[in-house]
Amino acid sequence: MRILGIDPGLARVGYGVIDTSNGQQQMLDCGIIRTNPGIDDGVRMVEIASDLRQLIRRWKPQLAAVEKFFFYRSSTTISVVQARGVIIMTLARFRVPMVEFPPMQIKLALAGSGHAEKDEVLDAVMRELNLDQPPRPDDAADALAIALTGWFQR
């Protein structure tokens, strides 16, 4: 199974693609979709949708796993929620089934504790994907953790 993990954001959307078809997890790609904060949010949303569309066409994921947020009060809440909506819409448009996980569930699935530290989750990502170096940037590593959670929780 090919899984696309997504760490939503407006300035940076992390993505990670894993393949599990050979009985073990393998990283195929990871990175970020970066938008320019100096341009209109609507244009940034179009860029996110366009880049995500390219990723879907290239990797043909059978499942997308997306981090689910629980916001309190934050000045970036609305824009991140809007970007997340664009991501969900793009996945639906290409008929990619989607699952969502809150951060605590991702930490629990990877590190065994919903209160695990970021480095514990990163160590688990490296171990599960047999990586010698940590994936960079952090948003891409987070997206790989989300993709792995999608595989573990299927």
Swiss-Prot record:
Its main location: cytoplasm. One of its GO terms (cellular component) is Holliday junction resolvase complex. Signal peptide: none annotated. It catalyses: Endonucleolytic cleavage at a junction such as a reciprocal single-stranded crossover between two homologous DNA duplexes (Holliday junction). It is found in: Cytoplasm. Its EC number is 3.1.21.10. The keyword Cell division does not apply. One of its GO terms (molecular function) is DNA binding. InterPro entries: RNaseH-like_sf, RNaseH_sf, X-over_junc_endoDNase_Mg_BS, X-over_junc_endoDNase_RuvC. Mg(2+) 1 binds at D7, D139. Mg(2+) 2 binds at E67. SUPFAM superfamilies: Ribonuclease H-like. Binds 2 Mg(2+) ion per subunit. One of its GO terms (biological process) is DNA repair. Homodimer which binds Holliday junction (HJ) DNA. The HJ becomes 2-fold symmetrical on binding to RuvC with unstacked arms; it has a different conformation from HJ DNA in complex with RuvA. In the full resolvosome a probable DNA-RuvA(4)-RuvB(12)-RuvC(2) complex forms which resolves the HJ. The RuvA-RuvB-RuvC complex processes Holliday junction (HJ) DNA during genetic recombination and DNA repair. Endonuclease that resolves HJ intermediates. Cleaves cruciform DNA by making single-stranded nicks across the HJ at symmetrical positions within the homologous arms, yielding a 5'-phosphate and a 3'-hydroxyl group; requires a central core of homology in the junction. The consensus cleavage sequence is 5'-(A/T)TT(C/G)-3'. Cleavage occurs on the 3'-side of the TT dinucleotide at the point of strand exchange. PANTHER family: CROSSOVER JUNCTION ENDODEOXYRIBONUCLEASE RUVC. Belongs to the RuvC family. NCBIfam families: PRK00039.2-1 (NF000711). This is Crossover junction endodeoxyribonuclease RuvC. It comes from Prochlorococcus marinus (strain MIT 9303). The gene is ruvC.
